């Protein structure tokens, strides 16, 4: 019903937030438990947060003059028996992942400057002979970020940098490709029908299937977690190089190391 969708929008636009618990669903049969908590207030049952307080849903409906929605055929299944909750969490994580990937490049570029690193591993020619899209994008991003840097352009005595600097295009690039893949899975999912059974009126058929199963998302989320963890791993190794007293930098990046702790911890 249009009123069902409208009431969901009314809740959101008026900061009426249903209380949803973070335990209770496996995702193997849809997000039954969290979605039940999310949509109970539509029918005047359950609890919500409103004006910073936990309230009974029916009292908030009364305050706004809203009648509890009377669900029609199959609306309950459509609201509860799907992957909306895990999809929403995934979209939130994806937005953060895109931002973290960009910030990882910015931080790594500054680290490369501080470590007196070479720009050679970021040149386009070396990316093109192993043309993974994320790797190419990372090389281009670093060339733009470091263009005109006197530290980068000055003469280097060392022939090459440690892996954690030299392999940034490959590692950051692989994470970019992983994020892009997971985003494609999510985009498909949030534009899909995931309840059950599914009605095909044009064919006069009702089919009990398994579109409620969260496996496509679960595998993708594990992939995303691995990819983001790699950004953290390689960043930690660069930090280690920066604080070891190499290339003219003081130990722990502080004057009088030993007396002063600096970035020891």
Which stretches of residues belong to each language-model region?
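Active-site cavity-forming subdomains of large catalytic enzyme subunits
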Residues: 1-129
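Short beta-alpha connecting loops at secondary-structure transitions
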Residues: 88, 124-128, 167, 208-209, ...
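An acidic intrinsically disordered interaction segment
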Residues: 2, 48-60, 180-195, 233, ...
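C-terminal catalytic subdomain
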Residues: 215-265
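Acidic, glycine-rich active-site loops and adjacent beta-strand->loop/helix elements
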Residues: 12, 24-26, 30, 204, ...
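A short glycine/serine-rich beta->alpha loop
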Residues: 17-26, 68, 206-215, 252-261
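Active-site-adjacent bridging/hinge elements
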Residues: 76-82, 195-203, 242-248
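Accessory "access/gating" subregions that flank catalytic or transport cores
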Residues: 112-233
